[in-house]
Amino acid sequence: MIKKIVALFLLVVSTSVFADDINLWKKSTLNKIVQKGELVVALEPGYMPFEMKDKRGRIIGYDVDIAKAMAKAMGVKLKIEETAFDGIIAGLLTNKYDIIISGMTITQQRNLKINFSDPYIVVGQTILLNKQYQNEIKTSKDLDNEKYTITAVLGQTGEIAARKFFKNAKVVTFETESEAVSEVLSGRAAAFVNDQPYNTVFMDGKGKDKLVHMDKPLTYEPLAFAIRKGDPDFLNWLNNFLRQIKEDKVVNLHEKLYQKWFVDTKWLQRVQ
């Protein structure tokens, strides 16, 4: 009798768990993407080489190619939703798009609101310095002085790093990277704090002979895809997608995209 009761109990529990799994899948963003046949990705152009516009106004970059590969793996169309970075999380939480692929750093503060996939690349914050200051500013510590103005992008980790490491300097924020770095090029600010890949690429172009790249990273920053909470199926798929493109040495997509956007800078001719 006891065995029958235990068996019945286990059956009820397993049935309940199975039903919960089915309900989770029905609510999953991944299921909805497959059903509608479209993946909607939010990003903000202007963050080289992750996302930017070419001379014809088309959005290109490392993140765009990752998004294309993701949509192809899902068997759906890709739609890019151009979104200002300071409101990009709010848009995700109000279901304006399915996922954020926009060079977003994993932070504990953001993680309280959204879930992150495993990192797809790791960067750090570095400094672009106006050349007129190169004799007086030899290390990042020298920049922590009230006589210096430092720029960063509003709401990004460059702003967080600037305020953390340069408490005595004046930190001024801007909506875009181009606005913030222009202040340094013009001499109105001494330095710009931003992600290392962007700063490296900028030095190969407009920053050459005008700026100094202090390329020792101030921070360790893993970048990841951002999705809404409560969606284990989507998160599982994303992590497996990342694992596949990183470990598949036949297709070698991860390495090819890294070479295309971070090593080879031919694409600069398309945006300048």
Model-derived features: positions:
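Extracytoplasmic small-molecule ligand-binding "clamshell" domains
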Residues: D20-G103, L112, V250
